[in-house]
Amino acid sequence: MFKSCLKSMREEKGLSQSELSKKSGVPLRNIQAYEQGYNDINKAQVITVLKLAEALDCDVYDIINPR
C-alpha cells in the first residue's frame, strides 16, 4: 500500500471524491485507488497529477509527497 496525502487535501477543500473527479477530469476509480493506497500516485501519469493539483489549487509537490 502507498500512502498519499490526496484524501486529506481533498477533504481540506471540502470536496467529495466524485466532485474532485468531475473538477479534475480524473476518473473516480483512480482517485479512490490513490486515496486507499492501491495505486501509487508517484507512478501516475504526469497529466493526472497536474489535473489533480489544478483542481485542488495546490502544487504538484503537495500531492506526491506524504505529509
Residue ranges and their predicted role:
Residues 38-51:
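Short, basic-rich loop-to-helix N-cap that marks the start of a DNA-contacting helix
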Residues 10, 21, 53:
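The alpha-helix within a helix-turn-helix
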Residues 1-14:
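A short, Lys/Arg-rich alpha-helix, primarily the initiator
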Residues 26-41:
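Recognition helix of helix-turn-helix/homeodomain-like DNA-binding domains
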